[in-house]
C-alpha cells in the first residue's frame, strides 16, 4: 500500500473513494483535493464499452474545449510553399518540411501538437515512431492532416484536445486547470462527452459509457455515478 503525504491525507479526510458521485460533485471534490503548489490539471478517465482491437470500434476524435486548457500550446506544422506563411500567420510556433523532420530526428520535439498537409505525410511518416508514442502524429480523423492549416492551428491554440481509447478501452483527456473552478471544468467535460457520444461505433453493443473518474495531477480519482451522466448532459 503506497504511503501518501499529509496534504494528500488531509484533502481526503472524510471521503470514501469507492463512493460514486454526481458529475458536479466529482468535479467539486477533485478540485477540493488539489493541494499541490502548482496549478494542477484536471483530467477525466472514461471507460467505454468498445473493444479497440477491432478497427471499427476504435474511438478517436478531437474536440475544441469551450473554456480552453489554460496553457500555452506549442504547435508545429509540417508543410511546404505558401502553406508555411499561412501557418505562421495563424500562430504556428514551428514550421517546416524536410528541415523540421531533421530536427525531430535529432531529438528536438519542443512542441505539444503537430499538423501536416496531406502532401507531406510520406515525409512525416519517416518520424512516425518518434511522434506516435508521444501522441504527436498528425491524423486525418482528428483534423490534424489538412490543407486548412490556419484552422487547425487556431483550434489547437484555442484548446483542442485529440483523444483516443487505449488498449483497455479507456479514454483519457485533460479538462483544464484547477484554477478554472467547477463551472468551466464542467463546461469542458460536457463538450467532451457530447463529442464522445457522437463517435459511438455502430458495432459497439451494450452500455457505451461504462465508468468515469475525475482527478487532478496529484490527486485521487473520484468516481462518477453513471446514472447521473444523462441528466448532466441534458441540463
UniProtKB/Swiss-Prot annotation:
Pfam families in the cross-refs: Ribosomal_L1
Assigned keywords, A-Z: Repressor, Ribonucleoprotein, Ribosomal protein, RNA-binding, rRNA-binding, Translation regulation, tRNA-binding
Residues spanning the signal sequence: none
Gene Ontology CC annotations of this record: cytosolic large ribosomal subunit
GO molecular function, one term: tRNA binding
InterPro entries on file: Ribosom_uL1_bac-type, Ribosomal_uL1, Ribosomal_uL1-like, Ribosomal_uL1/biogenesis, Ribosomal_uL1_3-a/b-sand, Ribosomal_uL1_CS
GO BP terms in the entry: regulation of translation; translation
Gene3D superfamilies on file: 3.30.190.20, 3.40.50.790
Disulfide bonds: none
Superkingdom field: Bacteria
Family, similarity comment: Belongs to the universal ribosomal protein uL1 family.
HAMAP family, sorted: Ribosomal_uL1_B
Subunit structure: Part of the 50S ribosomal subunit.
Function: Binds directly to 23S rRNA. The L1 stalk is quite mobile in the ribosome, and is involved in E site tRNA release. Protein L1 is also a translational repressor protein, it controls the translation of the L11 operon by binding to its mRNA.
Protein name, entry field: Large ribosomal subunit protein uL1
Encoding gene (name): rplA
